[in-house]
Structures are given as C-alpha cells and as structure tokens.
Amino acid sequence: MLIEHEVAFVLHVRPWRETSLLVEVLTQAYGRLGLIARGVQGLKKQTLRAALQPLQWIRFSAIQRGELGQLRQAEALDTAPRLKGETMLASFYINELLLRLVPRHAPVNELYLAYSQTRERLRTNDSLAWSLRLFELDILETLGVGFNLECDANGTPLDPAARYVLDPLEGPRLLLSEHNNAERRDTATGHVLLALAHKQIPNTNDLAGLRRSMRAVLLHHLGGRGLKSWEMIAAFRHQDTSP
C-alpha cells in the first residue's frame, strides 16, 4: 500500500540495523505505524533526521508492506515543543502509553486529535496534571475499555462528596469504609470524576487521588507491567524535593 503526503506525529525513534531507524508514528488515517527509514546517516540526511524526532509533526510518504513500512520521504511541519523538566517527562509518558497500549494499524482518529491537543498543552505547560488525565481517558475510550464516570458500578449517580475506587472493568465503586487509609489513598472524589467525565477542570486539590486511581486502571490494561516513564517521573520528583 502506498501512503502519500500523510501527516503524523513522531512517537519514538530507535536505531535499526547499521544505518537505518525504526520510526513509530501516529497518523489520523492509518493509526500507529512502524516505518523503516533507511540510510539516514551522513550530512545529506541531517534534515531528515531532524524531522524524525519524538513529538515532531511531519508529513511523510511510505510504502506499507506487512507490519513495517518503508519511509520514502518526511518533512517537519512545525517546530516541535522544546520541553524540559516535568513537561519533557510528560511527553515521554504519553508517547510510551501509546506505544504500549495502542496496536499498530488500529483506527485512532479521535486519539490523534487528542494527542495534538495534549502536545500543545505541553508546549504551554497548561494544567499539566489535568491534561494527562484527559489524555489517559481518551486512550481508554479509544481502546473501548473506558467506563461511565457519572454513575458507579451499580448505576447510582456519583455523589460529589463521596470517594470512589476505580475498578478497571466496572468503573467507580463507592468506598465503603473511611478507616482503610491505604485504600482511601488510591481513591478519587465523585467531584473530580464528574469533572473528568465532562472534561472540565475541577476546582479541587484532589488531582493526586485521580492520578493514582487512573494509574491503577492503566496498570491493569498494561498487564501489570509499569512504564519506564513512571519511574523517571518518580525519580525526578524525588530529586526535585531533595535538599
């Protein structure tokens, strides 16, 4: 299959054999693709190598044969966000999530748009934690494993003042005992879950609970094997708060 002048975001790049690269991209029309960029070493290929960087928005042409395609041409369409600190780690995170959870060639039209929006939020450092929660929700919904965030597993409307455990398969479950501090730590309020359902940033400090709740759900769908970016973010935060 010939793919011509398709736009995409570069997710990941790694060496492939001696002089080539394996480039993972996210497209609107074809989903996630793995493309082999051959012979990219040397001065004449500097422009191409510069375009094949994570977060870069590109236009490319390729020949798709089987699992991996052959990249024929690529050019940068803008300047990729220059990130540092937590925003840089957040970009690693969203890219790793896509690589681990979204299979190649799966239709992800809405997720492509969500990625574009999240990329711009990273550029402006706009409500970083909230932006990541929205993107996580978009991934779950795209994969068909999302859940109703307006009602609990029994169909009862969420109580904004109550706390809920996010079950990966059934959705919110009301926390029945406030005495289990360990379980309570990994819960989110009905208020913040309803805000997530309506994609309206909440006026609350409960985003940490939402982060832990969503991580538990994602870990289930990751088969119990965590992300390298989670480890990097934890190490960064520890270093950042150390004297």
From Swiss-Prot:
Using the record for this protein, list the coiled-coil segments as residue ranges, or answer none: none
Q: Which InterPro entries does the record cross-reference, listed alphabetically? A: ARFGAP/RecO, DNA_rep/recomb_RecO_N, NA-bd_OB-fold, RecO, RecO_C
Keyword DNA damage on entry: yes
UniProt keyword annotations, A-Z = DNA damage, DNA recombination, DNA repair
Q: May I ask which residue range the UniProt record assigns to the signal sequence?
A: none
| GO terms of biological process kind | DNA recombination; double-strand break repair
Please give the Gene3D superfamilies that the UniProt record associates with this protein. Nucleic acid-binding proteins, Recombination protein O, C-terminal domain
Q: One Gene Ontology cellular component annotation?
A: bacterial nucleoid
> Does the keyword Signal feature in the UniProt annotation?
no
One Pfam family per UniProt = RecO_N
Describe the task this protein carries out: Involved in DNA repair and RecF pathway recombination.
- By its UniProt entry, which NCBIfam families does this protein fall under? reco
Q: Which family does it belong to?
A: Belongs to the RecO family.
**Which PANTHER family does the protein's record reference?**
DNA REPAIR PROTEIN RECO
Q: What is this protein called?
A: DNA repair protein RecO
Query: What organism is the protein native to?
Result: Xylella fastidiosa (strain Temecula1 / ATCC 700964)
The gene designation is recO
